[in-house]
Amino acid sequence: MKKISLLIVSLFLFPSISYSNFYDGIWEVTDVVGESWFSLKKRHIGKTQEYWKGYAGGVFFTCNYKGLVTTRDSYTIDEFLNKEEFRLFSKHKDELDMEGTEVSVTRKTCTGNYLASRKEMYPIVNFENWDKAFYLSKGVIFVMEQDWSSD
């Protein structure tokens, strides 16, 4: 009985940790928004990022079945746009298709075999349209769309 109680308490304490992946599939980079160079757009548009049952591979992040962990935080659109770490989204909100009132911010971490091999892809942002994701990196926002043709 103690084990069941501990399990239930753990589920409430750590609700945002997930080993499953609703991002499963192939995501294609369709745009680059922000302070980017032309070559950055040229290098990334059309490239893909894939997630599949513990595997991640692509233009931004690779984790070869070695501890891919997903965590998420939820915000209202106002909370999200007012957070300092997401100020670039606020600056470019007219260029981005930010529909809805709820925002999901996801962190993908690959623990690897050693601490030195730990990698992270953060933040991956969705605005109620789960077919589109935004990845903020190095002062630019990469727009990714789910490639349903790969299913």
Task: Give the ranges of each region predicted by the language model.
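Beta-sheet ligand-binding and adhesion/scaffold domains
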Residues: 80-151
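Residue-level detector of intrinsically disordered/flexible regions characterized by low predicted structural confidence
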Residues: 4-5, 43, 104, 121
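Sec-dependent N-terminal signal peptides
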Residues: 4-15
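N-terminal glycine/threonine-rich, aromatic-flanked beta-hairpin/loop signature
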Residues: 38-88, 137-141
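A mature extracytoplasmic/lumenal domain signature
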Residues: 31, 67-69, 148
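Short, solvent-exposed loop/hinge segments that bridge or flank secondary-structure elements
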Residues: 23-24, 29-64, 105, 109-110, ...
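Sec/Tat signal peptide C-region and signal peptidase I cleavage site
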Residues: 16-20
